[in-house]
UniProtKB/Swiss-Prot annotation:
Catalysed reactions listed for this entry: (R)-4'-phosphopantetheine + ATP + H(+) = 3'-dephospho-CoA + diphosphate
The protein's name in its UniProt record: Phosphopantetheine adenylyltransferase
Binding site for substrate: S9, K41, L73, K87
Amino-acid positions noted as binding ATP in the UniProt annotation, renumbered to this chain: S9, F10, H17, G88, L89, R90, E98, Y122, S123, Y124, L125, S126, S127, S128
The protein's role, per its UniProt record: Reversibly transfers an adenylyl group from ATP to 4'-phosphopantetheine, yielding dephospho-CoA (dPCoA) and pyrophosphate.
Documented EC number(s): 2.7.7.3
Organism: Rhodococcus erythropolis (strain PR4 / NBRC 100887)
Length: 164
């Protein structure tokens, strides 16, 4: 059985993430989507909320499961017996950063990183950009699963109410 891990913060999951996850799921027997925990960053959504949104958005993919991890991703991949880390690349900036990470991960544990070119439809898309645009009232409904979009708008409204 071949398995891969697709890591990210997924705060929130976008249609670009889902495109990559779906394409990876077609290539591997098992795909573990892993929400990486970074305690130095305060996300818009909790880890549990992100996992819930990812589970809902990937429920049609029987070989995908969702987890979270705090620590070195390669340690998680080794622990779970996953043969590859798969990362979506939007452009050259992503590649420059991810290549160094891939080389370090390979050196540490021998786990390889595979890069998947993002569908051009989503090459501009990032969770950070979606949150920023939505916060200022921009329409991001076609960039997120419908349930995620609803939750994002609700969270933005909650934060606005807290700050007024």
């Amino acid at each position: 059985m071949t398995g891969a891990v697709c890591p990210g913060s997924f705060d929130p999951v976008t249609n670009g993430h889902l495109d990559v996850i779906g394409r990876v799921a077609a290539q591997f027997d098992e795909v573990v989507v892993t929400v990486l925990i970074n305690k130095s960053k305060r996300g818009m959504f909790t880890i549990d909320e992100r996992i819930e949104m990812l589970e809902d958005a990937t429920s049609h993919l029987p070989n995908v499961r969702v987890t979270s991890w705090h620590g070195l991703l390669v340690d998680y991949a080794k622990q779970e017996g996953l043969s590859a880390i798969v990362k979506g690349l939007r452009g050259a900036n992503d590649f420059d950063y991810e290549l160094q990470m891939a080389q370090m991960n390979q050196k540490l544990t021998g786990v390889d990183t595979l890069f998947v070119a993002t569908n051009p439809t989503y090459s501009y898309l990032s969770s950070s950009l979606v949150k920023e645009v939505a916060t200022f009232g921009g329409d991001v409904s076609d960039m997120l699963p419908a349930k995620v979009h609803s939750r994002l708008l609700a969270r933005i409204a909650e934060r606005a109410a807290e700050n007024s």
